[in-house]
Swiss-Prot record:
Free-text function comment from the UniProt entry: Promotes colloidosmotic lysis by binding to the midgut epithelial cells of many lepidopteran larvae. Active on Plutella xylostella and on Bombyx mori.
Name the record gives this protein: Pesticidal crystal protein Cry1Id
Pfam family for this entry, one: Endotoxin_M
Gene: cry1Id
Keywords of this entry: Sporulation, Toxin, Virulence
Length: 719
């Protein structure tokens, strides 16, 4: 191997203290010897040889790209945006050349080592082709109608094609949920389910213009609501089933386990987290959603391409157990934080003056929540005479890492380490991009280049990666054993912003995990899979947390608050801004003790009293009160809704109340008017059905009771 910048390396080496655990490997027992192997052959992983990514970049980029595109089109988009979204998805999922659906299948088959049966594969691919062809026809008709909205024939065509296509999705979805093959087909199911829900949304957006009746629009809307629950629970259940099947005991099993966790999050769970935001009655204007989950790229360690040297691969080199690795690199549920500084401590692995490796041996991370205090964590060895390297990342997004996995060989004992990392970053608020690097020196070793963008590619390829990156570095873990030091990077999605900015012209969703503190009694727990990240829990009364928010003017803008929560008990939610009480209200239990935390356990509710912010930066506080110890209350997120958005809901409530009152001869509701018929009562019932559960759930229940009473009176009168 050629050494790079030999003089620089020697200057590092001359000041370095040799770590005995690395320079005397033969003192340690090992069962992995390279029998009859040639030392040079073992190290023949040419300088900067790139590790073959487990899957093509385009496969994961499809999942990332579709989720990213949808994140920019939540709420009720313009007609042109809807057509553009379909055009994008058609190009991603039904491109020319090899079927993207086949690539999805092959990827998961490889991950879980399970082949899809020939019949199930062929049936799914045939149905997918039919759906793609039908979607393309509908998309073409939709574009024609957008350009000719007053053309009766064009309107009739798109309406009929819509109804036929929606029914086709209902018929074909079961082909992607074949018994015994749910896990390998899961990305197919998730993408098809996503398209079905987007299609159902079109009835709410365009149905009235197409000539659909209010009853027909409500039917499509109700189907969208029920299918959102079904699809969310299905995807979460089979994701967890597949992940648990891969749980093993050794380091090699952890590699596949982590790959499945990461890739299925990108291809399945990220989409599922967006499903509720397709509800146009809840989100009738542009809406900002955020994904706060973390994903982990592959460990930075050499993987030898020659099976004869398998013992030099990091996970075969007396690496820690599955559970030890998981505990070392996967963080416990925590508030969302941002990396500000990394201090790296190096160790020296030396065989000779021409074969040595200064490598990452430990680190100290500094990070903070939004508006919170600085926190630190330390891993690995920090007691070294090699000068530590400190890299600042305050207000910078590290969007890409290029890491060298190094292999140094002492006779029969390999040593795996990381001798170089380039961190590519950009300032959050400025169009300036650069990089910081860790590079203490090495010579005569085998190296492989691992590029994070092979696993977490940008959302698009049409822009520079420092503009279109999809993830930012959030944390670094270290797998540590006597002869292995392997890094694992943790990443958060770019949509989880650093500022909690509330806009006056859109609905702002803020996951509560973005609070800056965690009061006594509150805890962060793993999300159920469909929330896009972790959630907060309390089992006794008190504050959940404080969120530092930034307000875009005008400050006179008023908002109403919504909460997405689950609870085993009736309770009160209290909210305040900068310590001043804003809202307080009673809310119902959503689940029973011992029940699963599934989709139906969560409910989004709202306060009716509006409020405004007086400062550009404020602290918003939410707490849960008036319930018995031992119950469970969870909050996923809060939502700030500009007041104008809820006027329609208020109008609908008043209209329903007036229609009910008009059926009776007096305000005491004892006698129906003579002209009230069954059909009239059914129409009023549909009006009540369309009321917002989020704002007027109790009023809706009360009005339904009156409608039932009216039906009973009408039956008695007819008799």
């Amino acid at each position: 191997m050629k050494s790079k910048n030999q003089n620089m390396y020697r200057s590092f080496s001359s000041n370095a203290t040799v770590d005995k655990s690395f320079t005397d490997p033969l003192e340690h027992n090992t069962n992995m010897e390279l029998q009859n192997s040639n030392h040079e052959d073992c190290l023949k992983m040419s300088e900067y040889e790139s590790v073959e990514p487990f899957v093509s970049v385009s496969t994961i980029q499809t999942g990332i790209g579709i989720a990213g595109k949808i994140l920019g089109n939540l709420g009720v988009p313009f007609a042109g945006q809807v057509a553009s979204l379909y055009s994008f998805i058609l190009g991603e999922l039904w491109p020319k050349g090899k079927s993207q659906w086949e690539i999805f299948m092959e990827h998961v088959e490889e991950l879980i080592n399970q082949k899809i049966s020939t019949y199930a594969r062929n049936k799914a691919l045939a149905d997918l082709k039919g759906l793609g062809d039908a979607l393309a026809v509908y998309h073409e008709s939709l574009e024609s109608w957008i350009e000719n909205r007053n053309n009766t024939r064009v309107r009739s065509v798109v309406k009929n094609q819509y109804i036929a296509l929606e029914l086709m999705f209902v018929q074909k979805l079961p082909s992607f949920a074949v018994s015994g093959e749910e896990v390998p087909l899961l990305p197919i199911y998730a993408q098809a389910a996503n398209l079905h829900l987007l299609l159902l949304r079109d009835a709410s957006i365009f149905g009235k213009e197409w000539g659909l009746s209010e009853s027909e629009i409500s039917t499509f809307y109700n189907r969208q609501s029920s299918q959102t629950q079904e699809y969310s629970d299905y995807c979460s259940e089979w994701y967890n089933t597949g992940l648990n099947r891969l749980r093993g005991t050794n380091a090699e099993s952890w590699v596949r386990y982590n790959q499945f966790r990461r890739d299925m999050t990108l291809m399945v769970l990220d989409l599922v987290a967006l499903f509720p935001s397709y509800d146009t009655r809840m989100y009738p204007i542009p809406t900002s959603a955020q994904l706060t989950r973390e994903v982990y790229t592959d460990a930075i360690g050499t993987v030898h391409p020659n099976a004869s040297f398998a013992s030099t691969t990091w996970y075969n080199n007396n690496a820690p157990s599955f559970s030890t690795i998981e505990a070392a690199v996967v963080r416990n549920p925590h508030l969302l934080d941002f990396l500000e500084q990394v201090t790296i401590y190096s160790l020296l692995s030396r065989w000779s003056n021409t074969q040595y490796m200064n490598m990452w041996g430990g680190h100290k991370l500094e990070f903070r929540t939004i508006g919170g205090t600085l926190n630190t964590s330390t891993q690995g060895s920090t007691n070294t005479s090699i000068n530590p390297v400190t890299l600042p990342f305050t207000s910078r997004d590290v969007y890409r890492t290029e890491s060298l996995a190094g292999l140094n060989l002492f006779l029969t004992q390999p040593v795996n380490g990381v001798p170089r990392v380039d961190f590519h970053w950009k300032f959050v608020t400025h169009p300036i991009a650069s990089d910081n690097f860790y590079y203490p020196g090495y010579a005569g070793i085998g190296t492989q280049l691992q590029d994070s963008e092979n696993e977490l590619p940008p959302e698009t390829t049409g822009q520079p990666n420092y503009e279109s990156y999809s993830h930012r570095l959030s944390h670094i873990g270290l797998i540590s054993a006597s002869h292995v030091k392997a890094l694992v990077y943790s990443w958060t999605h770019r949509s989880a912003d650093r500022t909690n900015t509330i806009n006056s012209d859109s609905i702002t969703q803020i996951p509560l995990v973005k609070a800056f503190n965690l009061p006594s009694g509150a805890s962060v727990v793993r999300g159920p899979g469909f929330t896009g990240g972790d959630i907060l829990q309390r089992t006794n009364t008190g504050t959940f947390g404080d969120i530092r928010v930034n307000i875009n003017p005008p400050f006179a803008q008023r908002y109403r608050l919504r909460i997405r929560y689950a609870s085993t008990t009736n309770l009160e939610f209290h909210t305040s801004i900068n310590g001043k009480a804003i809202n307080q209200g009673n809310f119902s239990a959503t689940m029973n003790r011992g029940e699963d935390l599934d989709y139906k356990a969560f409910r989004t509710v709202g306060f009716t009293t509006p409020f405004s912010f007086s400062n550009a930066q404020s602290t918003f506080t939410i707490g849960a009160w008036n319930f018995s110890l031992g119950n469970e209350v969870y909050i996923d997120r809060i939502e700030f809704v500009p007041v104008e958005v809820t006027y329609e809901a208020e109008y609908d409530l008043k209209k329903a109340q007036d229609e009910i009152t008009a059926m009776f001869t007096s305000t005491n509701l004892r006698r129906l008017k003579t002209n009230v018929t069954d059909c009239h009562i059914d129409q009023v019932s549909n009006l009540v059905e369309s009321l917002s559960d989020e704002f007027y759930l109790d009023e809706k229940r009360e009005l339904f009771e009156i409608v039932k009473y009216a039906k009973q009176l009408n039956i008695e009168r007819n008799m």
